[in-house]
A protein has these predicted regions:
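Conserved glycine-rich Rossmann-like NAD(P)H-binding loop of the short-chain dehydrogenase/reductase
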Residues: 1-16
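A short, exposed helix-loop element centered on a Lys and neighboring polar residues
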Residues: 89-90, 137
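Hydrophobic structural elements of the Rossmann-like NAD(P)H-binding subdomain
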Residues: 49, 105, 152-155, 165
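Conserved internal alpha-helix within the Rossmann fold of NAD(P)-dependent oxidoreductases
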Residues: 84-89, 187
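Catalytic loop of short-chain dehydrogenase/reductase
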Residues: 54-58, 62-83, 98-146, 158
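Short beta-loop-alpha junction of Rossmann-like oxidoreductase domains
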Residues: 14, 115-116, 147, 156-169
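Rossmann-fold cofactor-recognition segment
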Residues: 15-32
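C-terminal helical subdomain
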Residues: 154, 162, 166-212
């Protein structure tokens, strides 16, 4: 059964259920992340899911060639896709259940796989997810020493109907373009079905382990 649910976002929102509490967090601020964790430090956490991510804004899009490489773009993408999630791990992993199976899962991407990269491009996004996958692997190794019941996962959600994927969905077949609810359902099954042997891996929405 589900107990309390804590959600964190850029702006706190009201929820229908009394079991759901929402707090503000800025994934680009270490102080904000630490304060967010402090707000639930008296609770034992069974599941932590990090869904922050950036691919494009009004000011930039994924790079198509080396001529598009830009310091500000790299800094912004790494800040949200890599550094923020790493710091969330730092402050939330110590709150995870040590007596029963607990899981921390990060939304990543197949394009972060070096062996799977045959198209090139998307320099900052690809490499930010590659770095995130390495961080998740590191978390899994450390958790073997500090919390043997904890699992760290990176997740490939597929292409989900959202503002995030809007500019690119024309290249995706209809059966591979998921609604947010369906994507959540698939990823929930992967998370709940995961084992200690898969800790540190990048798992696809269908349960496939994606090679680094």
């Amino acid at each position: 059964s589900v107990g309390n649910i804590f959600t964190f976002s850029r702006s706190a929102a009201d929820h229908i259920s009394e079991r759901v509490s929402n707090f503000e967090i800025d994934v680009e601020s270490q102080d904000s992340i630490q304060k967010a964790a402090d707000k639930i430090k008296d609770h034992i956490i069974d599941r932590v899911i990090i869904a922050s991510g950036i691919l494009h804004t009004e000011n930039f899009g994924p790079e198509k060639s080396i001529k598009d490489l830009n310091y500000e773009t790299f800094a912004k993408v790494y800040s949200i896709n890599t550094i923020g999630p790493a710091l969330i791990g730092r402050y939330f992993i110590p709150l995870m259940n040590k007596d029963e199976k607990s899981i921390i899962a990060f939304l990543s991407a197949r394009v972060g796989s070096i062996s799977d990269n045959s198209l090139g491009g998307w320099y900052s996004y690809r490499s930010s997810k590659t770095a995130l996958n390495q961080i998740v692997k590191n978390f899994s190794i450390e958790l073997k020493r500090t919390n043997k019941n904890a699992i760290a996962l990176a997740l490939q959600p597929g292409t989900v109907e959202s503002k995030f994927s809007e500019p690119f969905k024309k290249n995706v077949s209809k059966d591979k373009l998921f609604t947010p609810d369906y994507s959540v359902e698939l990823l929930s099954q992967v998370i709940e079905g995961s084992s200690a042997n898969e800790s540190g891996s990048l798992l696809s929405y269908d349960g496939e382990i994606i090679k680094p």
